[in-house]
Structure formats: structure tokens, C-alpha cells
Amino acid sequence: MKNKYPLPIMIIHWLTLFLVVLAYTTGGDPTVHLKTGELHVFAGISVFLLFLIRIIIISIYRKDIPLNKPRSKYQRTLFLMVKYTLYSLLFLIPVLGWVTLSGLTESYQLFAISLPLISNSWDVEIIGEVHEFLGNSFMVLIGFHALAALIHHYVFKDNVLKSMLYFKK
Ligand code: HEM
Ligand code: HEM
């Protein structure tokens, strides 16, 4: 068992953070705010594609994932709950964004490429609100996740944060 995450998983992890922050800071109706909207949709779709790649890469490197020993069984349950909630949101938020966009316009050009949209008769306003709510909740959860990593590093002084950092020995 290694004490660091494999490099491809580290790259996906930190690239996802960058893209989520980009998606969050460019949030808004992409059919109104054209330039930032394009960045929003690009970052959001990239998060979704990276999520799919992440699942494949993690299953390939299954045996090389560090076993950061939990301090108690409650901590392990909490870690797994946060992990699977993050996973679900990485999937759900972009999909809801895409459904909302499909209801707001009949065609959408992303860097001159026509994005495939679905025709639907759902209440786009509500789906848009849910997308926004989950987007905001996601940032709060990431904040807790990051805080936990920092507490591990500075208070418990263990290997958890270092296991996701390339440079730190
Ligand atoms: C991790 C990915 C994403 C995050 C964190 C995110 C977050 C957000 C947030 C917070 C808003 C509300 C902004 C505001 O009104 O102040 C928003 C709006 C919106 N997003 Fe996303 N988004 C993501 C991905 C996507 C994707 C992939 C699409 C489309 C393919 C999309 C389409 C939209 C649309 C259409 C709105 C406007 C909703 C409305 O006005 O009702 N988003 N997004
Ligand atoms: C978009 C933001 C983030 C997402 C979606 C995210 C998601 C995840 C996920 C799902 C894992 C479990 C490993 C895996 O399946 O890849 C993980 C592990 C980890 N993350 Fe994040 N993370 C984010 C941001 C951060 C930040 C800002 C920090 C630190 C400041 C951080 C530190 C860590 C550490 C140290 C681990 C290893 C935990 C362990 O194995 O015990 N993450 N992250």
C-alpha cells in the first residue's frame, strides 16, 4: 500500500478544484451573460467529463490508493459520506445545469460548437433553482472537506493532506 495517491488521481483532484471554482465564479444564465456563460458551461462540462475519467482511473489504480487510517469508525463513516456526496454532486450539478440550459434555449454554441441539448417540458425555473442551490451547497461541502484536510495536517499532523500533494515528502 502506497502513502500517496497515484499522480493521475492527484491531477484530476486538483484540476477538478480549479474547474469547480471557475464554474462557480462564472455562474449565471449563460444565454444572458454570453462570455462568462460560455466559461461556465465549459468548466461545468469539463467537471462532468473529469468525473467519468476519475471513476475509470480510480478503478484502474484501486490497489495503489493510500489507506489513510481513520482515527475512529465515526470518522471513517463521515469520510465516506462526504466522499460519496462529493461524487454525487460532481455528476448531478452539471446534468441539472445542462437540463436547465436545454429549457432556456433551443441551441447553444460553446466555442462555435453546437452543444447537444434535450427537448423537455419540465419546469426549468425549479430545476435551475435546484442547480443553483446544489452549486452553493457544493462549495460549502468543499470548504468542510478542505478544512478537514488542513486539520489533519496541522492538528493531527498525519499523512492525509500529504497523500494528495505531489511535492510534500
Ligand atoms: C460543477 C459545475 C457547476 C457549478 C458549480 C454550477 C453552479 C451554478 C450556480 C451557483 C449558478 C447560479 C448563479 C447565479 O445565478 O448567481 C448556476 C447557474 C446556471 N448554470 Fe451552472 N454550474 C455548474 C455546471 C453547469 C453546466 C455544465 C451547465 C450547462 C451545461 C450549467 C448551466 C447553468 C445555467 C443554465 C444556469 C442559470 C440557471 C437559471 O438562471 O435558472 N451549469 N450554475
Ligand atoms: C472541487 C473540490 C474538491 C473535490 C470535488 C474533492 C473531492 C475529493 C474526493 C472525492 C476525494 C477522495 C479520493 C478520490 O476519490 O479522488 C478527495 C480526497 C482528498 N482531498 Fe479533496 N476535493 C476537493 C478539494 C479539496 C481541497 C481544497 C483540499 C485541501 C485543501 C482537498 C484535500 C483532499 C485530501 C487531503 C484528500 C485525501 C483524503 C484521504 O484519502 O483521506 N480536497 N477529495
Predicted region positions:
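Membrane-embedded alpha-helical bundles that constitute the cytochrome b-like, heme-associated redox core
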Residues: 1-169
